[in-house]
Amino acid sequence: MLILTRRVGETLMIGDEVTVTVLGVKGNQVRIGVNAPKEVSVHREEIYQRIQAEKSQQSSY
């Protein structure tokens, strides 16, 4: 795992088309903004896991 340190307003690049920007830090929460092409799905981990579980349930019918 690559670990990076960024300050508010700083951005990191993932490939050529995805940017992740630190928007703010309040206590133990970090607000980030993600810019990605429409064909790239961006989800919080818990949402992604729920989507995968739903897909798995649908394929088992």
UniProtKB/Swiss-Prot annotation:
InterPro entries noted in UniProt: CsrA, CsrA_sf
The listed outcome for residue 4 to A is: 90% loss of in vivo repression and activation, 60-fold decreased affinity for RNA, about 60% wild-type protein levels
- Entry's localization field: Cytoplasm
- Documented effect of changing residue 42 to A: Loss of in vivo repression and activation, 135-fold decreased affinity for RNA, about 40% wild-type protein levels
Tell me the outcome of changing residue 3 to A: 80% loss of in vivo repression and activation, about 20% wild-type protein levels
What's a single GO MF annotation on this record?
Answer: mRNA 5'-UTR binding
Induction comment from the UniProt entry of this chain:
Activated by MqsR. Activated by DksA and (p)ppGpp, under partial control of RpoS, the sigma stress factor (at protein level). Binds to 4 sites in its own mRNA and represses translation. Expressed from 5 promoters; P2 and P5 depend on housekeeping sigma factor 70 (rpoD) while P1 and P3 2 depend on RpoS; indirect activation of P3 leads to increased transcription during the log to stationary phase shift.
The annotated consequence of residue 44 to A reads: Loss of in vivo repression and activation, 150-fold decreased affinity for RNA, >500% wild-type protein levels
**Phenotype of gene-disrupted mutants:** Essential, it cannot be deleted when cells grow on LB but cells will grow with pyruvate as the sole carbon source; if glycogen synthesis is impaired then cells become viable. Most deletion experiments use an allele which has a kanamycin-resistance cassette inserted after amino acid 50, which retains about 10% residual activity. Increased levels of glgC transcripts during both exponential and stationary phases. Decreased levels of enzymes involved in glycolysis. Increased biofilm formation. Decreased expression of it antagonistic small RNAs CsrB and CsrC.
Which SUPFAM superfamilies does the UniProt record give? CsrA-like
Pfam families in alphabetical order:
CsrA
Give the main location. cytoplasm
Q: Where is this region: Region 2, important for regulation and mRNA-binding?
A: 40-47
User: Which segments carry the region annotation Region 1, important for regulation and mRNA-binding?
Assistant: 2-7
Note whether GTP-binding occurs among the keywords: no
Recorded consequence of changing residue 40 to A: 90% loss of in vivo repression and activation, 67-fold decreased affinity for RNA, about 75% wild-type protein levels
Protein's GO biological process: mRNA catabolic process; mRNA stabilization; negative regulation of translation; negative regulation of translational initiation; positive regulation of translational initiation; regulation of carbohydrate metabolic process
Q: Which PANTHER family match?
A: CARBON STORAGE REGULATOR (PTHR34984:SF1)
The family classification in the record reads: Belongs to the CsrA/RsmA family.
What else is noted?
Identified as a multicopy suppressor of the slow growth phenotype of an rsgA (yjeQ) deletion mutant.
HAMAP family of this UniProt entry?
A: CsrA
Query: How is this protein organized at the quaternary level?
Result: Homodimer; the beta-strands of each monomer intercalate to form a hydrophobic core while the alpha-helices form wings that extend away from the core.
Notes on the domains? Two regions important for regulation and RNA-binding are found in the N-terminus (residues 2-7) and middle (residues 40-47). Both are part of the intercalated beta-strands that form the hydrophobic core of the protein; region 1 from one monomer contacts region 2 of the other. The homodimer has 2 distinct RNA-binding regions on opposite, solvent-exposed surface of the protein.
Q: Can you name this protein?
A: Carbon storage regulator
